[in-house]
């Protein structure tokens, strides 16, 4: 297939974890626009985390196809294509493999046999981009959860990916650390033209996105821009999603527009 504007395409993808189990994904089709921030949202059991597993090859489709840069992903080409995709998981403690920060960032580069001089340069550049270079010699237990997630992002950036997947990467952070991490992701996306895919149950995080896919019971429930999705905010509550605080307040005030950021709410008040 030919779609120059999409980096990842799901075409009629179905998936079940066991042959005698019900399908977790049912005939799912969507496009991930290149260079944009796509948020895939849904409650627990909606299928969103399974999508992430299929994208990085932890699981394989039962039927349908997944395309990466117009190439159908197969067993023969997967490892080559997978190198373009980085992922940051939910629990920062489960991602740290190095004894100190700089060794953790270097780990993936060692696996790719990157020469030592280039490795040193890439590690320093990646840590500088996430404001963690001064902590390059810190042990993991000296870092906060937000700082550990910054190191996880640095580890991904050092590999020069085209796509970064955030799989519930902010869910264990406090509100300030969460917002700081989202601000960092926005900066990284802008500076490197990286495609961001955030997998989340938090609609507040989806407000950051250019493109939103809402999953429910293994199917695509809604898809569109953040404005288009939140203009039908009440429908989202019927599938178990909690509306972001600014939208709740906006509705309580009787205003017409459903989509409203925190900054927009302050302006209205």
Swiss-Prot record:
Membrane topology category: Peripheral membrane protein
SUPFAM superfamilies the record matches: P-loop containing nucleoside triphosphate hydrolases
Subcellular location: Cell membrane
EC number(s) per entry: 7.-.-.-
Keywords of this entry: ATP-binding, Cell membrane, Membrane, Nucleotide-binding, Translocase, Transport
Binding site for ATP: 42-49
Record SMART domains: AAA (SM00382)
Entry keyword annotation includes Magnesium: no
Tree of life domain: Bacteria
InterPro entries linked to this entry: AAA+_ATPase, ABC_transporter-like_ATP-bd, ABC_transporter-like_CS, ABC_transpr_CbiO/EcfA_su, ECF_ABC_transporter_ATP-bd, EcfA_1, P-loop_NTPase
Nucleotide-binding among keywords: yes
Domain ABC transporter: 8-242
Entry's Gene Ontology cellular component terms: ATP-binding cassette (ABC) transporter complex
GO molecular function, one term: ATPase-coupled transmembrane transporter activity
One Pfam match: ABC_tran
Function noted in UniProt: ATP-binding (A) component of a common energy-coupling factor (ECF) ABC-transporter complex. Unlike classic ABC transporters this ECF transporter provides the energy necessary to transport a number of different substrates.
Subunit structure: Forms a stable energy-coupling factor (ECF) transporter complex composed of 2 membrane-embedded substrate-binding proteins (S component), 2 ATP-binding proteins (A component) and 2 transmembrane proteins (T component).
Family recorded in the similarity comment: Belongs to the ABC transporter superfamily. Energy-coupling factor EcfA family.
Protein name according to UniProt: Energy-coupling factor transporter ATP-binding protein EcfA1
Taxonomic source organism: Staphylococcus aureus (strain MRSA252)
């Amino acid at each position: 297939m030919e779609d120059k504007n999409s980096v990842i395409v799901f075409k009629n993808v179905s998936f079940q974890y066991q042959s005698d189990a019900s399908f977790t994904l049912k005939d799912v089709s969507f496009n991930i626009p290149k260079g944009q921030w796509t948020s895939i949202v849904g409650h627990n059991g909606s299928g969103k985390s399974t999508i992430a597993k299929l994208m990085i090859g932890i699981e394989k489709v039962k039927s349908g196809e997944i395309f990466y840069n117009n190439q159908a992903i197969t067993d023969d080409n997967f490892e080559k294509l997978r190198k373009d995709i980085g992922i940051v998981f939910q629990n920062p403690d489960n991602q740290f493999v190095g004894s100190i920060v700089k060794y953790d960032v270097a780990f993936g580069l060692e696996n790719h046999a990157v020469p030592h001089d280039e490795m040193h340069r890439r590690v320093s550049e990646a840590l500088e981009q996430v404001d963690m270079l001064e902590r390059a010699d810190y042990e993991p237990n000296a870092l906060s959860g937000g700082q550990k997630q910054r190191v996880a992002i640095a580890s991904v950036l050092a590999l020069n990916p085209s796509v970064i997947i955030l799989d519930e990467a902010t869910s264990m952070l406090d509100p300030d650390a969460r917002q700081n991490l989202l601000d960092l992701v926005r900066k990284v996306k802008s500076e490197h033209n990286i495609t961001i895919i955030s997998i989340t149950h938090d609609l507040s995080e989806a407000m950051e996105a250019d493109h939103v896919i809402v999953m429910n019971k293994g199917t695509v429930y809604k898809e569109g821009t953040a404005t288009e999705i939140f203009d039908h905010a009440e429908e989202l509550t019927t599938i178990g999603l909690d509306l972001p605080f600014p939208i709740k307040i906006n509705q309580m005030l009787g205003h017409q527009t459903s989509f409203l950021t925190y900054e927009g709410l302050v302006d209205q008040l």
